[in-house]
Amino acid sequence: VIINLSSLANKGKFNLKWQGEYCFGETWIAFRGMSAENNLHAHAALQLVAGAGITVTDDNTFEKQGNGWLIPSGVKHRITTSSPIVILLIEPDSFFANALQPSQQKGSVVQSLSLEILDTLLADIPLRDMMNKLETLYHQNNSVIDARLISAMTYLNSIDKRPTVELIGKHVGLSVSRLRALSTHYFGVPFSKIIVWKQVNLAFQSLAKGASLADAAYDAGFADQAHFTRIPRDTIGVTP
């Protein structure tokens, strides 16, 4: 799903005046466009950022300048640039994140992106096509996905509101524990983590249609508005 973020900013749904579009996946979210100067912050997601003349400032006010950076999970940072950028935020425990961040490079230091990743992120193609290419290149688990997990993912993507592990498991004939095990085997994360990313996606879609924060939180299955506000902030560093 592609969501125009500028429309949300114009409706007063976000404090940050980002101008561009979002694209969601099972364990990631991609943004392309103009970013606003943000405060020093950290989030759970592994972050990749690409563009012209990007300055990344860390918690020690040390600045790095370049065209592409990998920011590990939990590292405080600030990104500034006057040019359009691409940002990719990924569930840090997923196979996708592990493939993009080889074990020898893991740590708490901002690192330069490889030329292959940088070229893919900056390719002049639709955002979804760019992500499909990146996932094809860096999907670590190449085994054939279990048909039951495919059914669970299909059902998750077909429902409009309030997804739960119990609901998805019942629909495809799997116990909660079995669905968790299958998801962890194929994606590297339990199915509950995939649902969180889906909930953020659903909430953003509701906001794009004009829903209030409270209604968007309800539509996506968050406990309340405060829960919805906290999850995107902690996960991807964006506060609705």
Task: Name these PLM-found stretches.
Residues 30-33, 133-141, 180-188:
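Short, Lys/Arg-enriched N-terminal segment that forms or immediately precedes the first helix
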Residues 166, 185-223, 229:
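Terminal helix-turn-helix DNA-binding modules in bacterial transcription factors
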Residues 177, 226:
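Key DNA-contact positions within bacterial/archaeal DNA-binding proteins
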